[in-house]
């Protein structure tokens, strides 16, 4: 762990480093696709599968500059000897099925009633489920097969040279690229057979149209009529002084609500700092919201949640008998506080939380049935699991740091549930952020990515501990061996295979003299061979068994993201969520983070059914991923606010020792629109070895 050095130069550097944002963005490729754009029949062409994990043509990490060179993915696969061996036609629908009717929810009954998007065969039989991957692509699950794709997009010639920087504006639009809704850029096929055998291949997919009248809205448009109808609610001055005075620039005048959180008042912003650069990019040139987005911003979600709900363009002035916000509730003297204060050197807190869940019904609980206050560890309750909070530095790795911390804590929670007793907790090294940063072909490295795709890599490839590939906050070359695909007869090797072991020539010698007493999980996972210990073999990798959006698909939060997220946290441990951070968030110190009337972009991404009911609650613009560990309630200015407890990735010097509280129950800045869960796998890799060892030692 890095030492804390309290010097003037260190503090100046820290102030510049802590506030990076687009380099922690979770919107990375210049694409935007919505659920309604993908509905209909798709033809999937599949290649052969093998035990080797393949990039299917992507670079590591995935790069925009590399992607645009592939203008025809189907042709690209064929030219690289990836012949198609089978074909499948599916129908992506906006109908829903119950999660419990498709997936095993025996140990997670709270998920059984989730409503997820259905996949049909050509005879209109339900064969699986699907989701958009935020707004970049989609994933289809049919039995033991998973098809993940990023949508095709290309520059339209209206802008300068192609770069790897994010080309989306603050409303999720771009003037520089066009997204295709009818074909994909990359497709990865994964098959999970019995006995944990995983096979991998590639696929190409394109929309099928039965008649010419169906061929419409194939591509996104950079300008539409709606963009001409905007409400000018803030100015465009991008001078630094106005950026620092962000409330005056961005939010409605006349906002008399007292602040719900405190800020630092001594932040030193240098012109060439990451803080200045980020604020200029995300907030100094923030565009006005389109009229449809302004309509959507007046309700909890972008889409109406029932047939009677209508869009309300009038801001509540507080002059009615109705509450100003559904999150402002009357003070209740009968609050139940179940926060635990266990010893951080043991699993005591996790065990007490687990025992508390055993006394509650297994079904999904209503909010009033859940504890008023609950946490898996935070500084306000003085029970943080560990002191050091990851500092992502000058790299947009928040999507990795957050998901891997949640994964680590869920490993600990799951071990407690399996062993059901108190024991010393030896998991004192974080999972390797750098492995995902350098080696993922789904995400864009320091330019950002999605926690959903981090989880996918954890399931398919496994993640070693940080000690084996330490975090450098740079896009180091992935140290995995790369070999040609067996079908690559012409030697081009454009489609690369990943072997599940680090190159013996990689720069690991510095770490060969590890004190294993300080990395107990490494000891449990290691084999006798020194070479195997310091090469990332199967036994040294932590696998995910399952992962998904909370609710079963993107935007499928049942019009009550608060409830389903609370249930998931309560049962299984921390989750990851994303939101759009305003400039005020950079200087957060304490309290409940909430900025009234912050112009947050969102869209309804689905058409209503005949009965006016929307199954999807829409797309929210987000730019930061964080961990949610619990929740609580706090009285501020005579009102009781509900909040989430979050863990950031900007080090201990930010916020409350690296943690923060954010408004709960109102989907503030999209916080309740796209959360994720991940489940550890104890049937293979390091998880299997550790569980068996601990069961033996504890006599289970």
Swiss-Prot record:
The gene is DPAP1. It catalyses: Release of an N-terminal dipeptide, Xaa-Yaa-|-Zaa-, except when Xaa is Arg or Lys, or Yaa or Zaa is Pro. This is Dipeptidyl aminopeptidase 1. It comes from Plasmodium falciparum (isolate 3D7). InterPro entries: CatC, CathepsinC_exc, CathepsinC_exc_dom_sf, Papain-like_cys_pep_sf, Pept_asp_AS, Pept_his_AS, Peptidase_C1A, Peptidase_C1A_C. Glycans are attached at residues 52, 144, 265, 337, 373, 481, 490, 507, 615, 667. Optimum pH is 6-6.5. Pfam families: CathepsinC_exc, Peptidase_C1. It comes from the Eukaryota. Belongs to the peptidase C1 family.
